């Protein structure tokens, strides 16, 4: 199995390639039966890729087979992924080999460049521990990583508002026991500082609070909410 074939198989297993695109590619491949095994190979070759349940089972079976040969979690992580902090320990398994290379700094406390010590994969990471308690990871190329090391960062996580919007595509904000917690106050302040015209309703949605609470958070910072 070539590295390109392995990469394509993993892309399907983790959901980063369309079903029909993968089916057409797979049927054009030779010499995959031996590394995949007769049963799995036949399942992938003969499946109805229009059936979502079938596709889900295929992805799960393929991931289990491929994971047995991996020394890290990188190949199984989607190109854009959310890794919960704590919980079932996925974050510990992922970050057992992913090491910090560069912090953005300059007030962007959440943004980092990291690299896997096993496979060499680079990741741009937004560590969001105020609202979602998630790590958001973007798989990036070696060229993009070199650009970051030259202080040219991609825009995807470059503002806190963008990070929170990405968070909403994966989960709902954590419910804070303290409606006026420091993390909420600081987050509202960060959002307003970067985009002064942001509305109370927008801040409320991003932080997972009511508009009334969002207004109080801004007032706690000495900010006057827009009318």
Feature annotation, model-predicted:
Residues 202-206:
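Short alpha-helical "recognition helix" segments of helix-turn-helix
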Residues 79, 121-124:
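Short functional micro-motifs and their immediate structural scaffolds
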Residues 211-224:
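Major-groove recognition helix of helix-turn-helix-like DNA-binding domains
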Residues 1-110, 129, 133-141, 145-146, ...:
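Acidic, Ser/Pro/Thr-rich low-complexity regulatory regions
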Residues 164-187:
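Short, Lys/Arg-enriched anionic-surface-contact patches
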């Amino acid at each position: 199995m070539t590295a390109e074939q392995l990469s394509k198989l993993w892309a399907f297993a983790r959901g980063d390639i369309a079903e029909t695109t993968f089916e057409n590619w797979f049927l054009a491949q030779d010499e995959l039966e031996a590394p995949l095994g007769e049963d799995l190979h036949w399942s992938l070759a003969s499946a109805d890729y229009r059936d979502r349940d079938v596709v889900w089972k295929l992805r799960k079976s393929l991931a289990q087979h491929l994971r047995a040969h991996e020394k890290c979690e990188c190949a199984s992580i989607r190109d854009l992924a959310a890794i919960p902090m704590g919980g079932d320990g996925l974050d510990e398994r992922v970050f057992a080999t992913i090491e910090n290379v560069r912090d953005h700094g300059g007030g962007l406390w959440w943004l980092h460049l990291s690299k896997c010590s096993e496979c060499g994969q680079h990741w741009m990471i937004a560590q969001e521990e105020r609202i979602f308690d998630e790590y958001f990871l973007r798989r990036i190329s070696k060229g993009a990583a070199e650009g970051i090391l030259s202080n040219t960062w991609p825009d995807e996580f470059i503002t806190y508002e963008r990070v929170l919007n990405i968070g909403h595509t994966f989960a709902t904000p954590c419910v804070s026991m303290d409606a006026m917690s420091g993390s909420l106050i600081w987050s509202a302040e960060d959002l307003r500082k970067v985009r002064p015209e942001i509305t109370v309703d927008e801040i409320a949605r991003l932080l997972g609070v009511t508009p009334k609470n969002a207004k109080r958070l801004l007032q706690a910072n000495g900010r006057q909410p827009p009318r």
